[in-house]
Amino acid sequence: MASSINASTTAGVVTTADTSGVLALQTAGTTAIAISASQAVTLTGAITPSQTAGIVGTTTNNNANAGSVGEVVSSSVAVGSAVSLTTAAGAFTGKTITSISLTAGDWDVFGSVGINMAATTNFTASAGGINTVADTLNSLYEEETRFSYGAGGFVPNNVFSFAFPTTRVSIASTTTYYLIGYASFTISTATAFGRITARRMR
């Protein structure tokens, strides 16, 4: 194989004479294509990595850059800073615990909600999930976790928490997602805390 590539340069673009060809490196060669941090590669065709080696992941405890696949956005409220809940008047009322802002893209959103109640609080139902509307549960039951304790309710006298299903969101512009907690109860008080996390998939 030749040790050089014959090409012409126009306006900073390198073009080979045969535009239908393939750039091939030696099978046992030690030379790699290096791209500096100030440069980028734009591909308009499909990327086909090795089926076994694939795309190498990070080898240390760092984070993906904003806008890159793997980016994580998260927000949490600890039990000591839990927000107060009021007895729900409707099926989809709730309380915003915290929120995150996601830029355009394809995301997986997941998290958990915790309910903290006083010793005498009597619960008949609780729920948690995400929504794009503040202080409102999502009307899609499959995107939330809900519990019903019957007409008699129960008095847990403790803190309990639960995860809600991972939800894919594909958005064309920056959107706020709220972590919502809900409780239907009588007597005494209840508060909600939790975490909402999103990871960019595309």
Regions found by a protein language model. Name each.
Residues A2-T48:
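Beta-strand-rich receptor-binding modules of extracellular spikes/adhesins
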Residues A24, A34, I100-S101, R168-S170, ...:
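Generic structural detector for well-ordered beta-strands
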Residues T86-T96, F110-T174, I180-A192, R199-R202:
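Terminal beta-strand-rich extracellular "head" domains
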Residues V13-A17, T98-T103:
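Short secondary-structure boundary/capping segments within folded domains
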Residues Q51-N65:
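Extracellular beta-solenoid/beta-roll
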Residues S101-D108, T174:
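Extended extracellular/luminal ectodomain segments enriched in beta-structured repeat modules
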Residues A24, T42, D108, T176-Y178:
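General beta-strand recognition
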Residues N61-T98:
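Solvent-exposed, flexible loop/coil segments flanking beta-strands in beta-rich domains
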